[in-house]
Curated annotation (Swiss-Prot):
NCBIfam families: rplT_bact (TIGR01032). The lineage of its organism: Bacteria, Pseudomonadati, Campylobacterota, Epsilonproteobacteria, Nautiliales. GO terms for cellular component: ribonucleoprotein complex; ribosome. GO terms for biological process: ribosomal large subunit assembly; translation. The keyword Ribosomal protein applies. The keyword Transmembrane does not apply. InterPro entries: Ribosomal_bL20 (IPR005813), RIBOSOMAL_L20_CS (IPR049946), Ribosomal_protein_bL20_C (IPR035566). Belongs to the bacterial ribosomal protein bL20 family. Binds directly to 23S ribosomal RNA and is necessary for the in vitro assembly process of the 50S ribosomal subunit. It is not involved in the protein synthesizing functions of that subunit. This is Large ribosomal subunit protein bL20. Keywords: Ribonucleoprotein, Ribosomal protein, RNA-binding, rRNA-binding. GO terms for molecular function: rRNA binding; structural constituent of ribosome. The gene is rplT.
Length: 116
């Protein structure tokens, strides 16, 4: 006996179309296009979750470097000075400190300079 996919297909299609909400034009309305775009979107999402970490690290380093140069030291010498001084602050914290608390950052820079 032949089995038709009636409700199963509808459920499967609805699931894909629900996830495609917010896509443009036929990529939201047509099952095949929606499925293809959704697959692509998930690939982008996976890739960009990895890239996000790299991008933020780059941003933090840029901010720290700018703040270091205002205090007459290069980024690399500053990081070397921190490790020699035994100060274990990560780049996220240092970048935040450089942006929001320049006086505290200056004190850290002075300790790093003294350790060199």
């Amino acid at each position: 006996m032949r089995v038709k996919t009636g409700t199963v297909r509808r459920r499967r299609h609805k699931k894909i179309l629900k996830q495609a909400k917010g896509f443009y034009s036929g990529r939201r309305k047509h099952f095949r296009k929606a499925k293809e775009q959704l697959e692509r979107s998930l690939v982008y999402a996976y890739r960009d979750r990895k890239q996000k970490k790299r991008e933020f690290r780059k941003l933090w380093i840029t901010r720290i470097n700018a703040a270091c140069r205002l205090n007459d030291i290069s980024y690399s010498r500053f990081i070397h000075g921190l490790s020699k001084a035994g100060i274990e602050l990560d780049r996220k914290i240092l970048a935040d400190m450089a942006m929001n608390e320049p006086e505290a950052f200056k004190a850290v820079v002075e300790k790093a300079k003294a350790a060199l």
